C-alpha cells in the first residue's frame, strides 16, 4: 500500500517527549593546563615591604706566595625587588548555587566548579607571566595584520607569536597605555591569528605593530623568563646586567638548525663562564626545536625518558614526560617541550637558584565569610576571588637561551 503524506511513524521527532536524554559525565578540558615552570620552582615566603639581600660577586682579595699580599674586601651587590598583585575572579548567582546543590540539579555543584575554574585560570595566567617579558605583553600585531570584520570585531595576525599566551574567553588591551577591553573569541594556531571583540562603548581600533596585553597587566606582571634570560643591558633586581657574573648566557643560531654539538657547546660555555660544574639543570624547548634535536638524538639514544615530578608539594600528584639528555663534561640535563617557549628557542635554567616568593595570604580570599563566596552588596550573587601577592626571582646568571633557530 502506498504511504500517505498524512501518515506519521513513531520516531525521535514525532514523539520526542517520550525520550530521555542520557547526560554523560562532565568532560575533560581541551585546553592548555600545563604548569611546568611553576611546579619546578621553590616557594619562599614574602614578607615586608620589599625583599632585600646581599649577593657576593667576587672573592676577597689578598692572596700571594712568598710574602704577605695586599688585601681587598670581597665585592657584593644588593638584590632588591617588590611584590606585585595577580588576581582571578568570577561572579556566581546565589540562585544558581542553590539549584545545583545535588546531582539531580546539575552536572557539577556550583560551589565547586567556579573555584576549580578560577584556580585553573590563575595557574594558566601565572605560567604565562613566568615565561613572559615582565610587562604583561601577550604578543604583537604583524605588519598588515588587522582585518576589520565590522561591529568592533577584528581578526589579528600575530608577529612571531607564542600562541599559548592566547586563550578564548580571556580579555586583553591593545596598544600601549590603552585600557579599552577586547575579548579573545577565537585562536588559530596554524594561521597565527586571533579574533577579538571590542567591548560596548569602547573606541580603540587595533593597528599593525600594536602590542597586545593581558587586561590591566601592562607593566604589572612579575619578572618573566623571556625578559631575564635575554637581558644584555640595564638592571635586573637592582644589579647591572653588564656585570660578567650577572648576565645570562645566550647563543644566536642565525636561522641554523640546532644540533647536539651546539646544545653541548652552550652548556659547556656557560659552565666555563660561570665557573660551576653543571651550571644548568633544566631546559625547556620550543616544540620545533625539540623535534629537531630529538630527530638527531634518536639514532644515538643519548637520552633517557623520565617522569618529571613537581617540587611544589601541593602538586605532588602531577608529572610530565621529559627526557634527560646526556652530554660530555656538562653532564645530564632534564629537557621538556613547552608551549610558552618560542618555536625558535631553547631556554636553560638552574632551578636551584630560582624561586617564587609569595605572601602567606595568597590564594582564595576567605576573610569576609570564612568561605571563598564573597557576598555582593547590591546584587543577589557571590564573587569568588583568588589573589596572589609576591614576585618571581630569576637571577640572569642562572639562565640561558639558544635563539634564532630554524623553524622550517
Per-region residue spans from a language model:
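Glycine-rich loop at the start of a catalytic domain that most often binds anionic cofactors/ligands
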Residues: 67
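Core alpha/beta structural scaffold of self-assembling particle/tube/pore-forming proteins
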Residues: 1-59, 75-408
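N-terminal amphipathic/basic membrane-interacting segments and domains
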Residues: 61-62, 71
